Amino acid sequence: MKSKPDWLKVKMPTGSAFYEMRNLMKLHKLNTVCEEAACPNIGECWNKKHATVMILGSTCTRACAFCNVASGIPDKLDPHEPQSLAKAVSSLKLQHVVITSVDRDDLEDGGAGHFVECIEEIRKRDSNVTIEILTPDFLNKHDAIDKIAKAFPDVYNHNVETVPRLYAKIRPKARYFHSLYLLKTIKQKNPRIFTKSGIMVGLGELKEEIYQVMDDLRSADVDFIVIGQYLQPTSKHAVVDRYVTPEEFDHYKYVAYSKGFLMVASGPLVRSSYHAEEDFQRLKKNRAAMYT
């Protein structure tokens, strides 16, 4: 594994708020993608009491080459998880919550109904909490999109992850154009939902391919693009082709804004839910500015 440049080095997580978050997640038996995916920003986010909760168990039915989440035979659904999540959100007095999940190809609706239950339970306790969901692709789950659109999350996020040329190597069980279809259809069914998608760089993609992904996402009416450095979790995962410089990330940000995105987050350590609450407020302001 290649040694990381200085701009990718982060401090070990510490602090009372960090341990409070960890203990609360354990108390409510909740998984977080922060831990399962070994996110480099966990210390910063948890000290701000920001966390991305991972529902539908901790075992994924796929084994993407970039992802550190365990794969195999998935857990049984916890019918109490939506209520446990709502209690945790209330205990932490969160104003914005991000919910993601493993892929659940074994479930008839891919877990879409469980997402809906989580949204409903949180809003029962506090209708002012804003909710962002980061979902799998619900491939061949025909009712999933309708369920999600009707539930009306404030932000709908689904990551395309990489350029289409690399899908066979990096995301072999997914389909690039299905992901675009999913994002576009959610927006068509409920135009008030903000849509968001992310891509990793440093996997061997070309700049021109990144620009094409930007164009494809804008054609799907995606509001917000996230661009971050791929980091190899273990020796068994896809190898980092190169470390993209901060200056290159700034260039991608400039290009993305020029293509019409309402929001762009681009940087070496940027991840899908990094600064999610602050970015949601900026999204609202940027949309409002379009109509003034």
UniProtKB/Swiss-Prot annotation:
Q: Spell out the GO cellular component terms annotated for this protein, sorted alphabetically and separated by semicolons.
A: cytoplasm
Superkingdom of source: Bacteria
Which class of enzymes does this protein belong to?
transferase
Cofactor binding note of this UniProt entry:
Binds 2 [4Fe-4S] clusters per subunit. One cluster is coordinated with 3 cysteines and an exchangeable S-adenosyl-L-methionine.
Q: Which positions bind [4Fe-4S] cluster 2?
A: C60, C64, C67
Answer yes or no on keyword S-adenosyl-L-methionine.
yes
User: What CDD domains does the annotation carry?
Assistant: Radical_SAM (cd01335)
For this chain, the family text in UniProt reads: Belongs to the radical SAM superfamily. Lipoyl synthase family.
What is the name of the protein in this document? Answer: Lipoyl synthase
Q: What are the top taxonomic ranks of the organism? A: Bacteria, Pseudomonadati, Pseudomonadota, Alphaproteobacteria, Rickettsiales
